[in-house]
Amino acid sequence: MNIGQASKASGVSTKMIRYYDEIGLVRPASRTGSNYREYDDRQVNELRFIKRARGLGFAVAEIQHLLSLWRDRARPSREVKAIAERHLADLDARIAEMQAMADTLRRLSDCCAGDDRPDCPILEDLTGKRETV
């Protein structure tokens, strides 16, 4: 199948498929005489794998490692689990950071009258003149 058909079958844009080819993540099964990329079911499954992994927030390097493990039928599942648990710990840390930011912004917003007066604790905090609430 051509790149457009592979895109439709996998749900991955043609632009991203070309990018994944460039970085060596997924190679076309073959090339036509006119040098067009051709894909088969294996690459479509790999593209779906990548799309799902990206949707879970894995970085390209992690996806490359996961793909190599997926392709290796003799892989130890503990290695896959370790990658997933590291990623989960990173996600938990980012969520905690974002929650702290949201809590701070919520407190600052609660302190702002939001009326016609010019004084605003949000702007004061952003300039560093006000200690974070």
Q: What does each model-found stretch correspond to?
A:
Residues 2-8, 27-33, 41-133:
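Arg/Lys-rich, alpha-helical DNA-contact motif
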Residues 24:
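Glycine-centered, phosphate/nucleic-acid-interacting loop/turn motifs that mediate DNA/RNA or nucleotide
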Residues 6-7, 17-20, 39:
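Append "Primarily bacterial transcriptional regulators
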